[in-house]
Amino acid sequence: ICLNVVSSNGVRYLRNNVNTNITKQWECMALAETADEQPESELKASESIVHNAVHFDRGAGLRTNMERHTKEIKKAANYMRGKKKKNEFEQIALGAVDTFFREADEASRNINSKRFDERFDRMEQTNELVHGSYNYHNIIFQGREVVTSNFENAKVGIQIMDLYGFLRKTMEKNGWKQDLGRRMIASYEEKRSLSEEERHLLYTLLLYPEKYWKQCNFYYNGKKSWMSSKSYEKLLRIRGQEEGRIQFLEMIKDVLF
């Protein structure tokens, strides 16, 4: 048994080469009654997925999280500025904070725009589902079929979030190659067209400096007196990619708008 495509029609079950859509917890329980050979742990996990999706907070978390992350960038920067002796990580982080905070602040203001209210409302009305962790670790190719696994983070949300997560991680690993990003968006739209609101939302999500925030937050909540060489290397890589990332964002504007 595999959980496959998530859509507004529910979570598609692929079992014995037969597709079934489930949108409610009781449907998952009914499936369990006809699948004695199915491991109990898998049934409980899938039941939890549907339960969590139906009872999710309907998208408010997206706006709240972005605002909170922006405040955390500022908090970490203020702490680093207050230190008399700064290590290499702190010097690099502070040298880039103005650029990244400006991006974070702009994205935070954009996400709270009224232009997205209707899109969030539609998500709530349709119980639109997202995978929540759509990346190459969770994608399995079976012949001409593509199966998605690991739905632990599935929830009600705007489906563009899955495209954003997949696109951002792919771009990070490929140096923000503009042609690759352009082709990925074009391929997505061959199957599902993006609305005007989704285009603006995708740009806003890509604008937010997610990787920089993660490093600042990890630093602030960790042992500040000890610099992790891995964190330092990640921060250097983030800074080194920023010019290409900015150029990619400019290109995306032309593609999306």
Where are these regions (language model features)?
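ATP-dependent phospho-/nucleotidyl transfer catalytic cores
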Residues: 13-19, 26, 52-129, 231
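Short acidic/histidine-centered micro-motifs embedded in hydrophobic/aromatic stretches
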Residues: 117, 204-205
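ATP-binding pocket architecture of kinase catalytic cores
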Residues: 1-56
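Active-site acidic catalytic loop and adjacent metal/ATP-binding pocket
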Residues: 1-5, 110-159
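Active-site activation/catalytic loop segments of kinase-like enzymes and analogous catalytic loops
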Residues: 160-193, 206-226
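ATP/Mg2+ or Mg2+-diphosphate-binding catalytic cores
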Residues: 213-257
